[in-house]
């Protein structure tokens, strides 16, 4: 398969257009395949065996790649092999049964409600402070991903219906309720935004009027965590985790939390049940007469 590079181009277009994967996922897949191509000596997929690819995975593992990274490598190889098989370029997919080491489950870290309230108690000193408060209120109110919030346009927010339209992973749309506190914060920000020379329809813009980048949003949140005196770092996903945990603690409705978070698989949401159990265990230890140690 002499024109393997051109098939990689076609594959990335297929991922972006037909599979509608995010640009970041497409870039990650491309990187994994280009790295594999280099390590395998740019051999044709028609010549590769499962043993070749297993050897590649073992080599990457010895180089210290994490289980998460190896899982991405295996996924990219499987998907590319399946694509070539479908296009009739190979007779069998050598990556079909490829596996990576199991990832250890790490519980997402979240803020307790008091810490969230402290973080969001931002004095309305200027327009940027109002904007940042609105951003963090919306993160916590809706459990949005960073990419979802950054992509929001003004038209996506229906203040009358108290809803926001979000485009999530795989270009899937979901309509989410927005809490009254977040709506009020966004309303204060929009008064400032309407007086700015905005260059596009983005809901959240910089002082120059351009859409806020992912990195800018992260940096502002880190700054506010320091200003507000929080002892831990704060990033968008931490507020998303906090939203999920607090919702589950209050409602116990795993399916509803799954829908709100935009998880395609309930198993992804179930990690929060471990956090919820930790909360219940603390309550039990503090309240049940038989749970307390003698002398407490």
Swiss-Prot record:
The keyword Lyase does not apply. The active site is at 145, 169, 237, 240, 263, 272 (o-(3'-phospho-dna)-tyrosine intermediate). Keywords: Cell cycle, Cell division, Chromosome partition, Cytoplasm, DNA integration, DNA recombination, DNA-binding. The keyword Cytoplasm applies. Belongs to the 'phage' integrase family. XerC subfamily. GO terms for molecular function: DNA binding; tyrosine-based site-specific recombinase activity. Forms a cyclic heterotetrameric complex composed of two molecules of XerC and two molecules of XerD. It comes from Shewanella amazonensis (strain ATCC BAA-1098 / SB2B). PANTHER family: PHAGE INTEGRASE-RELATED, TYROSINE RECOMBINASE XERC. This is Tyrosine recombinase XerC. Residues 2-85 form the Core-binding (CB) domain.
């Amino acid at each position: 398969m002499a024109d393997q590079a051109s098939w990689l181009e076609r594959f990335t277009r297929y991922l972006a257009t037909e599979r509608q994967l995010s640009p970041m996922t497409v870039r990650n897949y491309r990187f994994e395949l280009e790295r594999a191509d280099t390590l395998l000596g740019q051999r044709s997929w028609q010549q590769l065996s499962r043993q070749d690819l297993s050897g590649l995975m073992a080599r990457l593992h010895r180089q210290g790649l994490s289980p998460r990274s190896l899982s991405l490598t295996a996924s990219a190889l499987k998907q590319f092999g399946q694509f070539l098989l479908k296009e009739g370029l190979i007779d069998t997919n050598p990556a079909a049964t490829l596996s990576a080491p199991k990832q250890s489950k790490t519980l997402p870290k979240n803020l307790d409600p008091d810490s969230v309230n402290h973080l969001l108690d931002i004095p309305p000193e200027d327009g940027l402070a109002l904007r940042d408060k609105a951003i963090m209120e919306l993160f916590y109110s809706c459990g949005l991903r960073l990419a979802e919030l950054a992509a929001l346009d003004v038209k996506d927010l229906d203040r009358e219906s108290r809803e926001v339209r979000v485009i999530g992973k795989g270009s899937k749309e979901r309509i989410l309720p927005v809490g009254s506190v977040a709506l009020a914060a966004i309303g204060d920000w929009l008064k400032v935004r309407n007086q700015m020379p905005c260059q596009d329809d983005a809901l959240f813009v910089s002082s120059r009027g351009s859409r806020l980048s992912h990195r800018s949003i992260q940096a502002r949140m880190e700054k506010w965590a320091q200003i507000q005196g929080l002892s831990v770092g704060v990033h968008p996903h931490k507020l998303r985790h906090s939203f999920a945990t607090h919702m589950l603690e209050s409602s116990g409705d795993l399916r509803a939390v799954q829908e709100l978070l935009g998880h395609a698989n309930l198993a992804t949401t179930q990690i929060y049940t471990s956090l919820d159990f930790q909360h219940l265990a603390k309550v039990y230890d503090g309240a049940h007469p038989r749970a307390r140690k003698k002398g407490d």
